[in-house]
Amino acid sequence: VVVEDRPMPTLLESTDAVIKLAASCICGSDLWPYRGAQPVDHQQMGHEYIGEVIEVGDDVKTVKPGDFVVGSFCISCGECATCQDGYPSRCLKAIAAGDGFIGMRSNGTQAEYARIPFADGTLVKTPAYPTAEQIPHLMAASDVLGTGWYAADAAKAGPGKTIAVVGDGAVGLGAVIGAKQLGAEKIIMMSRNPKRQELAKQFGATHVVEERGEEGIAKVLELTDGVGAHGVVEAVGTQQAFDQALGCVRHGGYIGFVGVPHDSSIGTDVLFGKQVHLEGGPAPVRKYLPTLIDLIYKGEIEPGKVFDLVLPIDEAPKGYEAMDQRTATKVLLTM
C-alpha cells in the first residue's frame, strides 16, 4: 500500500456528485487484496465515505454543494426494479454504467475527494453538520454498521428471537447493534478477543462464546435448549465460519451472510435437511441509511466505537498492517 497524489476527481455524468471527504476508513474486505488473495493492479482503495458535497451534475436534485452526506459503498439509482424491490446494492442502472461499486470507474474513497455516481440514489443528507464526536459513528454507517444491520435483518432478528453472530470484526459488531435495535432477546457473540467481547456486550450482546467449530456449535445449542438460534449472522466469509453458522441455526431458521466468500461452498444437503432460509450478499446499505443516521443523531447508537485506531490518511499503510495483524478492529483515516 502506498499513498500518492492522483488527479482531482471530476463529474463524468450529469447524475454525479463530487465530495470532499471528512473521513474514510479501512475495511476488512480491503485486506483480501492486501494479502494477495484478490488480484489488483494499482487500484485506488476505499469504499466507505462521508463528507461535504462540493459539486453536482445538472440532473442531481436531492443534494447540493455544502450538504454533508453519508453514502453507500454500492451505487444505486433508486429508481430501477431492483432498487424498488429493496436491493439497491444490485442497482441495474449502476451496474450497466460500470459503476456498481465505489471505485469501479473512479477513485476509491481512501482519498481527500471522490466522485459519487448516481448521487440522488446513493447519498443521504444528514439533518445537520456533524460534530467531531458524530463523525466516527456516521463513518461506520457507510458500510460496517449498514452491512451488519442487513445481516441481522436477514437473520430475522426481532422480539423474542435469539441471534448468534459468527465474526467479531466491525461488521459482526454492527450486527450486534442491529439485532439489539431490532428487538432480539438473546444475542450470542462468538469471539475469542477480550476487547471485542467487551465492545459486543456494550452494543447489546447477552452471551459470548469463545469456542469455535463443533465446540462452538455445541455451546450455542446449550444456550438455546438444544434447539439452535432463530437466526445466525455470518460475517467472515470462510468455510469454517459458514459451517459454524449452519451448525448453530435451528431447523427452519435464518442465516444472514455478509462475509465476502473466499474458497467456501454451501452444503445444500444440510440446508435442505434443516430447512434453512438463506439471504446475503452485498448489503443494501442505502436502504438503511436514513434509519441509521436518525439513530446516530438521537444518540441511541454509537457504532463509531468500532474504530480503535485513528490515523491521518498519509499513514494508511500503518492502518492496513494493524488490521492485518488484528491489533486494530477498524481504522479511521482522517484528512
Task: Label each region the model flagged.
Residues 253:
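Glycine-centered, small-residue-biased loops immediately flanking beta-strands
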Residues 259-275:
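Rossmann-fold NAD(P)-binding glycine/threonine-rich loop
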